[in-house]
A protein has these predicted regions:
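Alpha-amylase-like alpha-glycosidases and glucanotransferases acting on alpha-linked glucans and related
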Residues: 1-73, 98-181
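Conserved, well-ordered alpha-helix/loop/beta-strand core segments that scaffold catalytic motifs
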Residues: 65, 70-98
Length: 181
């Protein structure tokens, strides 16, 4: 398969996330890397007219960010194959939480506990323990577990399945986030 064809195949096979991620990165760059909640209201709220405008305005940059993901995926796949052929398994982390300023939160705010302005109602952390006498404030938005339950936890299933394309063993970082929630 030619590189251009392989890139198109990658985009099709990863259409569920790569397009949104690439658009997010291009728009973020357009707004000088400020958090998406500081972008113009129309694109911050993903109004269709604004989405069309930025898809056209940032078309080349969107393709560039998708290509970067393709290049990483291709190189990582070759590395993983080499490691596996030599008896080495790759262990990878999947963080339980995503950053507030992320493609996930911008593309699907309904998955998180946000208010009407798409600001977090509460953020993640952990209480005092043996590692920290004062506890920790991580600042990540909390999930809307009712939404995830209604959707059969599909986002989680897809996320974890994708990790198993990248790693042989997946570690949830940190599991306490699930256990204590």
């Amino acid at each position: 398969e030619k590189p251009e064809e392989a890139f198109e195949t990658f985009k099709k096979e990863n259409s569920e996330w790569v397009g949104e991620y690439a658009l997010y990165m291009a728009v973020k760059n357009h707004f000088n890397s400020v958090s998406w909640n500081q972008w113009d209201e129309d694109i911050r709220n993903r109004e269709e007219k604004a989405m069309e405008h930025y898809r056209e305005l940032c078309r080349e940059e969107i393709d560039f960010y998708a290509w970067l993901q393709y290049e990483f995926y291709t190189q990582w796949g070759a590395l993983k194959d080499y490691a596996n052929q030599n008896g080495i398994q790759i262990i990878g982390d999947i963080p339980i939480y995503v950053a507030f300023d992320s493609a996930d939160t911008w593309a699907a705010p309904e998955m998180f506990q946000f208010d009407e302005k798409n600001e977090p109602k509460a953020v993640a952390g952990c209480p005092p323990d043996g590692f920290s006498a004062t506890g920790q404030l991580w600042g990540n938005p909390l999930y809307d577990w009712e939404y995830h339950k209604k959707t059969g936890y599909q986002w989680w299933i897809r996320r974890i399945e994708y990790c198993f394309k990248l790693y042989d063993i997946v570690r949830i970082d940190h599991f306490r986030g699930f256990d204590e929630y």
